[in-house]
Regions:
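Positively charged n-region of N-terminal signal peptides that target proteins for export
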Residues: 1-4
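Bacterial N-terminal signal peptides
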Residues: 7-16
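Extended, histidine- and acidic-residue-enriched regions that form the cofactor-binding/catalytic faces
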Residues: 21-101, 105-115, 119-137, 141-280
């Protein structure tokens, strides 16, 4: 396990160097840990930026129209925006791998196990605490069973460090709650149902990184297998599209992506402020 953690630390460092999310605007506060010097981190802590924001991205196939690093690209933009809006936080490097399984049919996914993610989250959280952060926030760009991992790690570490006045929280509203509410808004406007690599993922990637991560010429044919509602089962006689898309992404746009992105930031900052006892 220790060797695995060391290997992933090296991978994360490599990913950080290649990050396109840099603070180029001189007037914008430095909030990305990987783009700061140790002296700048120390000063930020002294100035009250004592909340560390950890966000997990992921390397996963996202249909023929989206690049495999979409979770990570969106994660970098999201966690930076949250840090800027909070004003008392630092965005830590985004983890580019999360629990998943590779496939030769749809090659694009490189995944961890839940056990390894647990170990990594515990390690980086405690490293942030050693660095001087008083609050650690865990967030992820995934649904499924992964939120349980974040919640369990946060609960365990919070119980361990609370006697020292240090807290660890899991912020879940940034992903499913924000997306579910936005999905209802779109459906009310006549947009088709969508899920993985559908209108939400594609639109948000168009807003965050545009041509760098979305093949816009393929959006017009970006339709996959249908989204199943609660209790629905797939028709065994219906042909499978199996192109990595669930739903319909053909009406994707950067404008829709911005609306979803802004909702994520709104939901996350509201929940984190509640954790920290700040005014909403």
């Amino acid at each position: 396990m220790q060797r695995a953690l060391v290997s992933f630390s090296m991978l994360i460092a490599f990913a950080s160097v290649s990050s396109a999310q840099t603070s180029k605007n001189a007037k914008e506060p430095l909030v990305e840990f990987e783009n700061m010097t140790w002296a700048e981190v120390k000063q930020a802590l002294a100035d009250g930026k004592t909340t560390a924001l950890f966000y997990t991205g992921g390397t996963e196939q996202r249909g023929p129209q989206n690049t495999n690093g979409g979770h990570t690209f969106m994660g970098r933009a999201t966690v930076k925006a949250i840090a800027l809006k909070l004003g008392n936080a630092i965005a830590m490097p985004v983890l580019p791998y999360t629990p998943n399984n590779a496939s030769a049919t749809l090659p694009g996914t490189i995944g961890l196990t839940n056990e390894l993610l647990t170990a990594i989250l515990e390690r980086v959280s405690e490293q942030a605490i050693t660095t001087g952060f008083k609050n650690v926030i865990l967030m992820g760009d995934h649904g499924g069973g992964q939120p349980t991992v974040y919640a369990d790690v946060a609960k365990r570490l919070d119980e361990k460090y609370a006697p020292q006045g240090i807290h660890v929280f899991y912020c879940d509203s940034v992903y499913a709650p924000a997306q579910d509410d936005f999905e209802k808004e779109l459906e009310a406007k006549g947009y088709p149902r969508s899920n993985h690599a559908g209108i939400f993922d594609t639109s948000e990637m168009m807003y965050v990184c545009g041509d760098a991560c979305v093949r816009k010429d393929l959006i017009k044919t970006a339709v996959g297998d249908p989204v199943l509602g609660p209790g629905e089962q797939r028709d065994p006689n219906a042909p499978r599209v199996n192109n990595g898309i669930t739903g319909d992404a053909r009406r994707s746009s950067a404008d829709i992506g911005k609306q979803l992105f802004d909702k994520r930031i709104e939901y996350a900052t509201r929940e984190i402020r509640r954790f920290l006892g700040m005014q909403p």
